[in-house]
């Protein structure tokens, strides 16, 4: 019996068999991704698809400087507010930057007709030619062109007026009827602006225009309107009780525009031949101009990124990532990062892909760890790793290419009377934005799930490849490991890794060792049966002796009486 127990203990203590394990790479990465089924999965490698940073500056767009209006609004710039004179030298720009609260707009109070539409038109203009449509000195010989100034449009402390308009007044006590036309020979659209003066009282009307009733008529192929001055007292704005209403039209190449009036005309002086450019726009921003270049400009600042999505601002100009409301869009490229606990032993927690990855394997995603008499070591499976890298890289590039539709997204212009339309437009835009955000997030979740499943499948395939080679020359011991029934030196280990393992060569040795182990198991089973019987009998005897002793003690002290009746 003692000899049999000794054999059993010796057999159980033998743990020096050669072993090979299949596992995967792990590192100290803290990157986390979300999948359809899980959140915050730690992975070895990932790529960010969402840009959330900017430089806080206005930059040149593709090397072309923007038109920074400074303290001027679009209206002040295009009408020629004297305080905006420094902007007249700007002939071309990449985009127009306007501050939220521009001081210099329409210096003489009044209504600017279709102002939001004009802004929309100018948002697609990248350059223009400013030219005299009606030269000041020779176009109006019967009218005064110098006295039409006002303190509300002062410049350097003196009364002045818009630099692109002429306020025609009476000359030598009369204001003759006028008729002036212009033919567009610029081969481009020409922007023409004019105004109609509405005095606050009849005395001003007579003093300036020498008549009580007046009209202004403007006609072209696409525009036909007749204006009648409205003489009325109004609240003072910028010191004025009168008003000037401002109007504009786009004159097509070859078209003619005709002005007729007998008073109250604020005549065009300069007009603009427009050149439209793709990617231009108007942004409202407090950011300052800087010496920098970018491909994408937002009101918050410039974005220099090739990522497909951004959450900086919905208004963009240039080649910009698509705006989404997401706070995180990270796509996994590596594996689940579950580093094994080194202290639990080589073939314990770090044995394979079931319990964790290997931080010691740094030259590939999947691979092997072996242990034999010659030592131990890691080796990556380069073929499966490279195939996985190629597949995932192509997928990531494809996703970025499909979603990376870069474009300009500018805000739409609405006036105060179009509030319901603006609110409806915002709801529609919000709906599209929600769809874009949902699609982007769902795409990333699905692709992350597929990538992690892909890695799991690759590890399993590598495991099955080894298992199919070894067959019954080794046994599975869990954790992705196999224990050989034969000695396997480094050459043998290498053959398993590269798929050239010679099964017949090791079959006989494996068979003998397998039978020896099976014999020990059978003998051990017999020993266990004897031990079980012995233990049962010994336990029963101990129980009977204990019961007898208790009964004798109870009878001796009278606690238990035994009567035998015959």
UniProtKB/Swiss-Prot annotation:
Belongs to the influenza viruses hemagglutinin family. Homotrimer of disulfide-linked HA1-HA2. Interacts with human CACNA1C. SUPFAM superfamilies: Influenza hemagglutinin (stalk) (SSF58064), Viral protein domain (SSF49818). Keywords: Clathrin- and caveolin-independent endocytosis of virus by host, Clathrin-mediated endocytosis of virus by host, Disulfide bond, Fusion of virus membrane with host endosomal membrane, Fusion of virus membrane with host membrane, Glycoprotein, Hemagglutinin, Host cell membrane, Host membrane, Host-virus interaction, Lipoprotein, Membrane, Palmitate, Signal, Transmembrane, Transmembrane helix, Viral attachment to host cell, Viral envelope protein, Viral penetration into host cytoplasm, Virion, Virus endocytosis by host, Virus entry into host cell. It comes from Influenza A virus (strain A/Kiev/59/1979 H1N1). One of its GO terms (biological process) is clathrin-dependent endocytosis of virus by host cell. GO terms for cellular component: host cell plasma membrane; membrane; viral envelope; virion membrane. A lipid is attached at residues 555, 562, 565 (S-palmitoyl cysteine). The gene is HA. Residues 1-17 form the signal peptide. Major glycoprotein, comprises over 80% of the envelope proteins present in virus particle. The extent of infection into host organism is determined by HA. Influenza viruses bud from the apical surface of polarized epithelial cells (e.g. bronchial epithelial cells) into lumen of lungs and are therefore usually pneumotropic. The reason is that HA is cleaved by tryptase clara which is restricted to lungs. However, HAs of H5 and H7 pantropic avian viruses subtypes can be cleaved by furin and subtilisin-type enzymes, allowing the virus to grow in other organs than lungs. The record marks 344-345 as: Cleavage. This is Hemagglutinin.
């Amino acid at each position: 019996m003692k000899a049999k127990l000794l054999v059993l203990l010796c057999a159980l203590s033998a743990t020096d068999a050669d072993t090979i394990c299949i596992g995967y790479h792990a590192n100290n990465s803290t990157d986390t991704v979300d999948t359809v089924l899980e959140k915050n999965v730690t992975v070895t490698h990932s790529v960010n698809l969402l840009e959330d940073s900017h430089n806080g500056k206005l930059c040149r767009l593709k090397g072309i400087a923007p038109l920074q209006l400074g303290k001027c609004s679009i209206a002040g710039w295009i009408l020629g507010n004297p305080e905006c004179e420094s902007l007249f030298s700007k002939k071309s720009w990449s985009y127009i930057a306007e501050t939220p609260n521009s001081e210099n707009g329409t210096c003489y109070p009044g209504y600017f007709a279709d102002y939001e539409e004009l802004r929309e038109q100018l948002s697609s203009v990248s350059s223009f030619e400013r030219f005299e449509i009606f030269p000041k000195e020779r176009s109006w010989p019967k009218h005064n062109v110098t006295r039409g100034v006002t303190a509300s449009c002062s410049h350097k402390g003196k009364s002045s007026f818009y630099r692109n308009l002429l306020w025609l007044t009476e000359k030598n006590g009369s204001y003759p009827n006028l008729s002036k036309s212009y033919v567009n020979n610029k081969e481009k659209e020409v922007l023409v602006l004019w105004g109609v003066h509405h005095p606050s009282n009849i005395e001003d009307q007579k003093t300036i225009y020498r008549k009580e009733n007046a009209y202004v008529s403007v006609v072209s192929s696409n525009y036909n309107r007749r204006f009648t001055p409205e003489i009325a007292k109004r609240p003072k704005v910028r010191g004025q009780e009168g008003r000037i209403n401002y109007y504009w039209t786009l004159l097509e190449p070859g078209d003619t525009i005709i002005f007729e009036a007998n008073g109250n005309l604020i005549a065009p002086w300069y007009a603009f031949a427009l050149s439209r450019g793709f990617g231009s726009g108007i942004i409202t921003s407090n950011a300052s101009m800087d010496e920098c270049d970018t491909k994408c400009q937002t009101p918050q600042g410039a974005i220099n990124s090739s990522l497909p999505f951004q959450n900086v601002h919905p208004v963009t100009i240039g080649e910009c990532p698509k705006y989404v409301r997401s706070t995180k869009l990270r796509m996994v490229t590596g594996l689940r990062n579950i580093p094994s606990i080194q202290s639990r032993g080589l073939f314990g927690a770090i044995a394979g892909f079931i319990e964790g990855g290997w931080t010691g394997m740094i030259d590939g995603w999947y691979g092997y760890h072996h242990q034999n008499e010659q030592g131990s070591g890691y080796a990556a499976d380069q073929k499966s790793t490279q195939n996985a890298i190629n597949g995932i890289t192509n997928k990531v590039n494809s996703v970025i290419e499909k979603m990376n539709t870069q474009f300009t997204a500018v805000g739409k212009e609405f006036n105060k009377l179009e509030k319901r339309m603006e609110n409806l437009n915002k709801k529609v835009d919000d709906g599209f934005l929600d769809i874009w955000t949902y699609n982007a997030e769902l795409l990333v979740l699905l692709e992350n799930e597929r990538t992690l499943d892909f890695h799991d499948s690759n590890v399993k395939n590598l495991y099955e490849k080894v298992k199919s080679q070894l067959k019954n020359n080794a046994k599975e011991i869990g954790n992705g490991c196999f224990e050989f029934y034969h000695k396997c030196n480094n050459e043998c280990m290498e053959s398993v890794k590269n798929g050239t393992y010679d099964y017949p060569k090791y079959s006989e040795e494996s068979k003998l060792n397998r039978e020896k182990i099976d014999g020990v198991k059978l003998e051990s089973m017999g020993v266990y049966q004897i031990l079980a019987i012995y233990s049962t009998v010994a336990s029963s005897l101990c129980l009977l002796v204990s019961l007898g002793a208790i009964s004798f003690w109870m009878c001796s002290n009278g606690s238990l009486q035994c009567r035998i009746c015959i």
